[in-house]
Amino acid sequence: MPDPRPLTPDQTHGRGHAEAAVDWEASRLYRLAQSERRAWTVAWAALAVTALSLIAIATMLPLKTTIPYLIEVEKSSGAASVVTQFEPRDFTPDTLMNQYWLTRYVAARERYDWHTIQHDYDYVRLLSAPAVRHDYETSYEAPDAPDRKYGAGTTLAVKILSAIDHGKGVGTVRFVRTRRDADGQGAAESSIWVATVAFAYDRPRALTQAQRWLNPLGFAVTSYRVDAEAGQP
């Protein structure tokens, strides 16, 4: 049975100390539990941020593309040109076609080989408008015409460095022209030139079937100028 007797002051005081000690211990344990909960919350939040960062990086990596650039240097002249990769969407069919005809025309007009001169001469005439064709034919009637100047002992080789279609029927072609002795003796002489060409298609003129095979689109140069590139020795 419970003791019905009241507690003495000393007993009451001792009991208060015991209850206070129990309350302090409970409070301490509660604070520790709260602190541990906060620590775990921060840890999980940091882990979530790290995971999201890794996912973002993994998602973005395929979007990063390294485009290689190859610098090609012409051995004889030292001319440098950039060779790059390109996607088909970077160029329209019209641009590619214009560049094709521009480079074909310039190469045929600027090179010289005694054994193929007639072929190049006829090809340049075919791809030239009347005024340009007349000027070209006249150049072969002059005393310093290429066939008289070089004869069979010299060749002029052409290497295209770049071709730019500026739109509205105008383009520029940059090229290296190298002069060599036909027998391979002697040092080669190279120089860099820029041809500025105006052109058009489907001009109303009569072409034979053989000519149409060589020039199916009726490409015709309406203006032609070639200049030595500035800054050469």
From Swiss-Prot:
Main location class: membrane
CDD domains found in the cross-reference section: VirB8 (cd16424)
InterPro entries the UniProt entry points to: NTF2-like_dom_sf, VirB8, VirB8/PtlE
Gene3D superfamilies: VirB8 protein
Keyword Transmembrane helix: yes
One annotated Gene Ontology cellular component of this protein: plasma membrane
Transmembrane segments: 42-62
Pfam families, per the entry: VirB8
Subcellular location: Cell inner membrane
Keyword annotations of the record: Cell inner membrane, Cell membrane, Membrane, Transmembrane, Transmembrane helix
Membrane topology, record value: Single-pass membrane protein
One GO biological process term: protein secretion by the type IV secretion system
Further comment found in the protein's record: B.bronchiseptica strain Bb55 harboring a functional ptx-ptl promoter from B.pertussis produces the PtlE protein in a stable form. Is also able to produce and secrete efficiently the pertussis toxin (PTX).
Family: Belongs to the virB8 family.
Name used for this protein in its record: Type IV secretion system protein PtlE homolog
Species name: Bordetella bronchiseptica (strain ATCC BAA-588 / NCTC 13252 / RB50) (Alcaligenes bronchisepticus)
